[in-house]
A protein has these predicted regions:
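C-terminal accessory/binding modules appended to enzymatic or scaffolding proteins
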Residues: 172-193
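Long, compositionally biased, intrinsically disordered segments
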Residues: 133-137, 167-174
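Secondary-structure transition/capping motifs at alpha-helix termini
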Residues: 4-11
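C-terminal non-catalytic accessory extensions
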Residues: 160, 164-165, 189-193
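Catalytic adenosine-cofactor/nucleotide-binding cores of aminoacyl-tRNA synthetases and other
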Residues: 16-163
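Glycine-centered secondary-structure boundary/capping sites
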Residues: 7, 138, 161-163, 169, ...
């Protein structure tokens, strides 16, 4: 009001939005809803966080553990697309900016979500277990040649151990399921190698 009274123009304010939890409420340290940057960096790469922040900078963002896998998969998809794009399209790809014009050229062989599923189904507590599964389907893939994937295995284990394993529930089989499982074990033992 004062600026208008003296005939001057209002200064441009700094536009920013808050971070929201999964319910769309403001993140609060006292409530513990949402995740911190340090937690994100335990579960995913700094580049995935940069990409998450880069997209829609003026819009409020939900920042909770459930967005991490999707953000990582979005990042991996953009890296994969980058190699196939024309030069002018590459400049429009956010990973060009996230990596200061030099995105990695590593072949993306599986999503972070798939690694989380592998970690969950195998109860993996180290990356060697995950690499055994990866190598079943991609024999030519080696950790030292696939830095992104190797880092993702560590992130997947951290995320699984902290966020998924505590919520994991095991169903006790009923009588019919016990019979079926017992029959399956017998059949598997009888298969000749």
């Amino acid at each position: 009001k004062i600026i208008n009274l003296i005939g001057k123009k209002n200064p441009s304010g700094f536009a920013y939005e808050l971070f929201l939890d999964e319910k769309g409420e403001k993140i609060s340290k006292s409530k513990g809803n949402g995740i911190t940057i340090d937690q994100w960096l335990k579960y995913a790469s700094p580049e995935s966080l940069s990409l998450y922040m880069y997209q829609n900078p003026k819009r409020a963002k939900k920042l909770y553990d459930g967005v991490v896998p999707k953000a990582v998969d979005d990042y991996l998809d953009l890296i994969d697309k980058f190699k196939k794009q024309k030069d002018n399209e590459k400049l429009m790809n956010p990973v060009w900016h996230v990596h200061n014009g030099n995105p990695p050229s590593e072949k993306i062989v599986m999503s972070f979500t798939m690694l989380l599923n592998l970690a969950g189904s195998s109860n993996a507590d180290n990356k060697e277990i995950l690499w055994k599964f990866i190598n079943r389907f991609h024999e030519d893939i080696k950790p030292q040649e696939n830095i992104i994937l190797d880092r993702l295995t560590n992130y997947a284990i951290n995320y699984f151990k902290d966020k998924l394993e505590p919520k994991k529930k095991y169903k006790k089989p009923d009588q019919n399921e016990k019979k079926a499982l017992t029959a399956l074990v017998v059949d598997l033992r009888n298969i000749k190698k």
